Amino acid sequence: METLCLRASFWLALVGCVISDNPERYSTNLSNHVDDFTTFRGTELSFLVTTHQPTNLVLPSNGSMHNYCPQQTKITSAFKYINTVISCTIFIVGMVGNATLLRIIYQNKCMRNGPNALIASLALGDLIYVVIDLPINVFKLLAGRWPFDHNDFGVFLCKLFPFLQKSSVGITVLNLCALSVDRYRAVASWSRVQGIGIPLVTAIEIVSIWILSFILAIPEAIGFVMVPFEYRGEQHKTCMLNATSKFMEFYQDVKDWWLFGFYFCMPLVCTAIFYTLMTCEMLNRRNGSLRIALSEHLKQRREVAKTVFCLVVIFALCWFPLHLSRILKKTVYNEMDKNRCELLSFLLLMDYIGINLATMNSCINPIALYFVSKKFKNCFQSCLCCCCYQSKSLMTSVPMNGTSIQWKNHDQNNHNTDRSSHKDSMN
């Protein structure tokens, strides 16, 4: 029976049950029987890590079982609960932050412009991921299995989970690129003052971003399936990427480099190019009476450019450890290396850190806007104070019209101070 279990587990590893390059695949396989085993796929082989035995069995690519890690490489239950706490914190902060950001842009007419529309699109993508994917992730961590793994709804979640995760990342990446291009356009046409409203070009960009993000995530929905397997005499099912066609095999082979190139390098390169062009444009137009007349106008645009640049830097910091771990698994790992077990432990820890940081990116943008942008900071304070006042009014049975009056008065007070900048504050 033990040999049969090992063969089944080895077969499972070969078809792709891995500690993956992205949160949805990694979390899927990490949570499935975390107290029983965790599989890790390197460049040429897969590990079967058993946490109930004193040693970890390493199954080389030739199928022999003479090589094994002398020490136990495992994922402790402490990490499971740490990840659960982190996920719950990200869920709360992401819900409040992104929902508040969307409310600010929707309720304040002076905030309805092109760049803010892109920021709202980014926040909505993060909110969808936080609301749908994070609860599934927490369930898997605590229950140790995929939700509804024995019915069709579990299959639906298995395809929806990676699809939404990849779509959310795509929306973030493409919105950051669009914001960088928008900042260059704003500086290049520095004599043009745009009024309130979302330009048609920006609306088309947002629709295109969402459509393209969904299209690029389709292979995830196609490839992820519920795969049954036997382990220690028991039948289990896990959600994983299982290539069943030539296209999916090709996608699985190049996915690491595709994710690194498109979902990480592209927004950084795009920002570097357009911010360099923007800097050159500003240096070439240092003089001129019109520029002096529009000095406050240009100051606002520089502040917005700084805000967008901050969002890109945060994105890079959050996602770099995860992509680095993936590249190391692709390029550094060697099954014949005597220190491969130490490398495995290091990559496991790196995956934990990288996935938590990558997930944190879904809730950190509203916080960054609060500290970087004075206008968003004022709006956040007004909105949150309004909510607190409304809650207090409900507890003390105060009529709700007082709340709306306070919000309107506060908005009127801020409107005068922001009148000179609302035309292009986030333009």
Curated annotation (Swiss-Prot):
SUPFAM superfamilies noted in UniProt: Family A G protein-coupled receptor-like
Implicated disorder: Mandibulofacial dysostosis with alopecia: A form of mandibulofacial dysostosis, a disorder characterized by malar and mandibular hypoplasia, typically associated with abnormalities of the ears and eyelids. MFDA features include maxillary dysmorphism with dysplastic zygomatic arch, hypoplastic mandible, scalp alopecia, scant eyebrows and eyelashes, severe hypoplasia or aplasia of eyelids, small cupped dysplastic ears, conductive hearing loss, cleft palate, dental anomalies, micrognathia, and limited jaw mobility.
InterPro entries registered for this protein in UniProt: Endthln_rcpt (IPR000499), ETA_rcpt (IPR002175), GPCR_endothelin_rcpt (IPR051193), GPCR_Rhodpsn (IPR000276), GPCR_Rhodpsn_7TM (IPR017452)
Protein name in the entry: Endothelin-1 receptor
Cytoplasmic side: 103-112, 182-205, 279-306, 373-427
Record's compositionally biased regions (Basic and acidic residues): 408-427
Topological type in the membrane: Multi-pass membrane protein
Ranges per topology, Extracellular: 21-80, 133-159, 230-256, 329-347
Family statement: Belongs to the G-protein coupled receptor 1 family. Endothelin receptor subfamily. EDNRA sub-subfamily.
Tissue specificity of this protein: Isoform 1, isoform 3 and isoform 4 are expressed in a variety of tissues, with highest levels in the aorta and cerebellum, followed by lung, atrium and cerebral cortex, lower levels in the placenta, kidney, adrenal gland, duodenum, colon, ventricle and liver but no expression in umbilical vein endothelial cells. Within the placenta, isoform 1, isoform 2, isoform 3 and isoform 4 are expressed in the villi and stem villi vessels.
Record's keyword annotation contains Chloroplast: no
CDD domains tied to this protein: 7tmA_ET-AR
GO biological process: activation of adenylate cyclase activity; adenylate cyclase-inhibiting G protein-coupled receptor signaling pathway; aorta development; artery smooth muscle contraction; atrial cardiac muscle tissue development; axon extension; axonogenesis involved in innervation; blood vessel remodeling
Function of the protein: Receptor for endothelin-1. Mediates its action by association with G proteins that activate a phosphatidylinositol-calcium second messenger system. The rank order of binding affinities for ET-A is: ET1 > ET2 >> ET3.
Transmembrane segments: 81-102, 113-132, 160-181, 206-229, 257-278, 307-328, 348-372
GO cellular component term of the entry, any: plasma membrane
Subcellular location: Cell membrane
Annotated consequence of substituting I136L: In a breast cancer sample; somatic mutation
Lineage of source species: Eukaryota, Metazoa, Chordata, Craniata, Vertebrata
Glycan attachment positions: N29, N62
A Pfam family recorded for this sequence: 7tm_1
